[in-house]
Amino acid sequence: MMQRVIIHVDMDYFYAAIEEREKPELLGKAVVVCMLSGRSELSGSVSTCNYIAREFGIRSGMPCSRAKKLNPEAVFLPVRKEFYTSVSDRIMEILRSYADPGENGDSFEQISVDEAFLEITYRAGGDFNLAFELGMQIKKEIKEKENLTCSIGIGPNKLIAKMASSAKKPDGITVVSPENQEAFLWPLKVSKLWGIGDVTAKKLQEMDIVTVKDLAEHDVIELISTFGKSRGTWLKQAASGIDDSPLKEREGSEQIGRIATLPEDTLDQELILSLLEKLAGDVIEKLDSRELSFRVVTVTVINSNFRTYTKSRTLNHPVSSKETLLEAAREILSEFLSESKTEFRRVGVRVGGLQKKKGQTSLFDY
């Protein structure tokens, strides 16, 4: 049986990296992207920050006001989630193109906007040296097409691949083959094991289990009596680098979209619709290549003041036609145009509620 090979791709400080790419004047500065509550200028929490900001002790989840105290010179920006999602969609398409051909999405698993697993067992022929070459190709393509970096972990399962991607951040690649997994895992603090939170780590410490090696060599009966059969067994297996969990894309959670900049800032409906039609065509092409239908249509506009607005329509049935997509997009765009006095700079369309086609191609009854 061929040796399983899994890649975990983790985009480096994703939101902040996109902002640096879009605004080159930010390079060399501490950049903090905040999920703002709107109550005051910096009320809210840090969504992500670049590595320069991290040198000042700024971390995700921290109140923005505290981050400001740690580095008053940092550049604070609001989250532009719709825009980041559109970038993510393109990156996920790149990653899917490298995954093994699989049925029912069992060779690709997107776990967040900036992370995904892909199985390359057959593409790499079970060879970790070839897997490394494929990993380097992925990094090169993402850099060329999106001007962003990622960190990659390659291992015999999801657990090892996920942990390997954290070993050389940012912009690194780490390969952990089966014969090297103990050398990689065992020296680590047990709190570094993927799936172990603060509460479990504290309990393990109370049991004098400090490293992953300590956990791997600990009596499984005692682990089961402390954590229960399922959790105790999992802890023992994880510390030994055992993980048989499959890759599975959750139906309905994925979205496919495109966003682009208009030739000029405008409120001209024909000009905007012309671009929307092209973007919709690209989206339908991606859907057709994977035999998917959709149920949710979302249009995003970014105005000349760089404010982002989105509206969605949920259809009565899953559909897969460009005409239906455009019909919904036109309606949403008309609403935007009737409400806005500020010209649009960028426009995008995306679809969600994805599922495998079941024969129907066009349903206008929504």
Swiss-Prot record:
Its cofactor is Mg(2+). Binds 2 magnesium ions per subunit. The gene is dbh. Poorly processive, error-prone DNA polymerase involved in untargeted mutagenesis. Copies undamaged DNA at stalled replication forks, which arise in vivo from mismatched or misaligned primer ends. These misaligned primers can be extended by PolIV. Exhibits no 3'-5' exonuclease (proofreading) activity. May be involved in translesional synthesis. It catalyses: DNA(n) + a 2'-deoxyribonucleoside 5'-triphosphate = DNA(n+1) + diphosphate. Belongs to the DNA polymerase type-Y family. Its EC number is 2.7.7.7. Mg(2+) binds at residues 10, 114. GO terms for biological process: DNA-templated DNA replication; error-prone translesion synthesis. It is an enzyme of class 2 (transferase). The record marks 15 as: Substrate discrimination. This is DNA polymerase IV. PANTHER family: DNA POLYMERASE KAPPA, DNA REPAIR POLYMERASE UMUC / TRANSFERASE FAMILY MEMBER. Keywords: Cytoplasm, DNA damage, DNA repair, DNA replication, DNA-binding, DNA-directed DNA polymerase, Magnesium, Metal-binding, Mutator protein, Nucleotidyltransferase, Transferase. GO terms for cellular component: cytoplasm. Monomer. The keyword DNA damage applies. Its main location: cytoplasm. GO terms for molecular function: damaged DNA binding; DNA-directed DNA polymerase activity; magnesium ion binding. InterPro entries: DNA/RNA_pol_sf, DNA_pol_Y-fam_lit_finger_sf, DNA_pol_Y-fam_little_finger, DNA_polymerase-Y, DNApol_IV, PolY_HhH_motif, Rev_trsase/Diguanyl_cyclase, UmuC. It is found in: Cytoplasm. Residues 6-197 form the UmuC domain.
